[in-house]
Amino acid sequence: SDGRNDAAKAFDLISSTVKKGCCSHPACAGNNQHICGRRR
């Protein structure tokens, strides 16, 4: 099987966690714009 699928799933899981937690904090969101988006 292709390991990239597992990596993608792990990345999605991390990203969703970061979106819920980090992205609600302006300083953290600013450091993770590639995940959180650039809205303020």
UniProtKB/Swiss-Prot annotation:
This is Alpha-conotoxin GIC. Its main location: secreted. It is found in: Secreted. Belongs to the conotoxin A superfamily. It holds the Pfam family Toxin_8. Expressed by the venom duct. The modification Cysteine amide is found at residue 36. One of its GO terms (molecular function) is toxin activity. It comes from the Eukaryota. Residues 24-26 are annotated as: Ser-Xaa-Pro motif, crucial for potent interaction with nAChR. The keyword Disulfide bond applies. GO terms for cellular component: extracellular region; host cell postsynaptic membrane. The lineage of its organism: Eukaryota, Metazoa, Spiralia, Lophotrochozoa, Mollusca.
